Amino acid sequence: ADVGIAMGIAGTEVTKEASDIVLLDDSFSTIMKAVQWGRGIYENFKRFIQFQLTVNVSSVVVVVCSILAGFETPFTALELLWINIIMDGPPALTLGLEPIRDDILNRPPTRRDENIISKSMLSRIFVNGIFISAIFMLQHFTNFLGASPEQEPTVLFTMFVVFQLFNAFNCRELDRTPMYK
């Protein structure tokens, strides 16, 4: 962010009024802490977005593929609501509260014109979403787990929820590690 910083104790009134942030303790280490926290919050926000978009991509692909293939939709409206409210909430919240990484200040700053969703993040969203959808649809179409017709809706729902939990763990790392490591 482009912000002006003024010293609260030693700074003049003119600089305090012209600046965006006034340091109350006149310590430069406070600036470093603020930058560290800002970068950490930004990274956690990206993790949250990656998780939510992957869940939504896989949900849409599963429902659309089922309809186009002539199968019954795998989820009821109540199950989709449960996935989006109950299932997405806690994992997304924990991704938003991830501890700040130690090396965050060693990385270069984010460019002003950089998108929140990078190309590598977008590819991870779609690859993970399609992977989850493919395994789910394989079960939906072929029943490789051997569930009875009465058990099939429960198996599909549970499978989708478990995949989203794995997705939450996968979203803990953004760009620095290979997928599925």
Task: Show the residue positions of the predicted features.
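Membrane-embedded transport module
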Residues: 8-178
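Acidic, divalent-metal-coordinating active-site segment for phosphoryl/phosphodiester hydrolysis
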Residues: 1
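Mid-to-C-terminal catalytic subdomains of enzymes
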Residues: 181
